[in-house]
C-alpha cells in the first residue's frame, strides 16, 4: 500500500516549465539481485517488474537535503527532460525499502556508464553501427540542449547494447548556457568518432 510523504517543495528556475514534483512513496517488500553501486545509490533488479531496477539512495550521501527530496527532484527532472524529447533512462516512481528511499527506473541491460567510458575505465565496442548510434544520439542531445538553452547539472549517460545513449540521474535542469553540458556530450561523441575513424583505416 502506498505511503504518502510530504517532500519539500523543489526549487524552481526561470523558464523551466513547472512539472509536479512526485511525493508519494510506494513501499516495496523486497529487491532482487544487486546490479551495481554509484556514489550515492545502490542499484537492484526489481522483483515487482523485471523491466525495471530499483535505485536506493544510501544514507548521508545527499548533503543538506533529504533522500526523499533528492529522489523526488531527480524523478521530476527526468520527466521534464523526457517531455522535452531528450532520451532518458525513464523513471517511474518513488519507492521505499529497508528504510531507504529510491526510484524505480528502466533496467538497461549490459549498460555502460559514460563516466567509465570518458575516463577510460571501460571501453565502448568498436562496432560501426554501435558507434554511429552513439554519435547520432549525442548530436540529438546537443541540438536539444541548444534549442531549449538548458544546462543539466551532473550530466551523465547510460549506453545500451546497441549504442543508444540515455541521460541518467539528472541532478537539476536549469535555463542557462548549454555550453558546459554540450562539452560533456562531445567528450562521449569524440570517443565514438575516434572508433569510426579507426575502423575506416
Curated annotation (Swiss-Prot):
Changing residue 41 to A: Loss of kinase activity. Changing residue 169 to A: Loss of kinase activity. Does not induce severe disease symptoms in plants. GO terms for cellular component: extracellular region; host cell. Its main location: secreted. It catalyses: L-seryl-[protein] + ATP = O-phospho-L-seryl-[protein] + ADP + H(+). Adopts a minimal and atypical protein kinase fold. This is Type III effector protein HopBF1.
Amino acid at each position: 500500500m502506498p505511503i504518502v510523504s510530504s517532500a519539500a517543495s523543489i526549487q524552481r528556475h526561470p523558464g523551466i516549465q513547472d512539472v509536479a514534483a512526485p511525493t508519494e512513496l510506494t513501499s516495496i517488500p523486497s529487491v532482487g539481485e544487486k546490479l551495481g553501486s554509484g556514489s550515492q545509490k545502490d542499484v537492484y533488479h526489481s522483483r515487482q517488474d523485471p523491466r525495471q531496477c530499483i535505485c536506493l539512495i544510501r544514507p548521508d550521501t545527499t548533503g543538506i537535503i533529504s533522500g526523499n527530496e533528492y529522489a523526488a527532484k531527480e524523478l521530476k527532472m527526468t520527466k521534464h527532460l523526457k517531455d522535452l524529447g531528450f532520451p532518458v533512462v525513464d523513471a517511474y516512481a518513488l519507492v521505499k525499502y529497508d528504510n531507504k528511499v529510491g526510484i524505480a527506473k528502466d533496467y538497461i541491460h549490459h549498460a555502460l556508464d559514460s563516466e567509465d567510458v570518458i575516463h577510460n575505465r571501460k571501453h565502448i565496442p568498436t562496432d560501426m553501427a554501435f558507434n554511429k548510434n552513439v554519435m547520432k544520439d549525442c548530436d540529438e542531445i546537443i541540438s536539444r540542449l541548444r534549442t531549449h538553452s538548458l544546462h543539466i547539472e551532473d550530466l551523465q549517460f547510460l549506453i545500451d547494447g546497441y549504442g543508444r545513449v540515455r541521460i541518467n540521474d539528472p541532478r537539476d535542469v536549469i535555463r542557462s548556457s548549454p555550453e558546459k553540458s554540450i562539452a560533456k556530450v562531445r567528450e562521449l561523441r569524440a570517443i565514438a568518432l575516434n572508433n569510426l575513424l579507426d575502423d575506416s583505416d
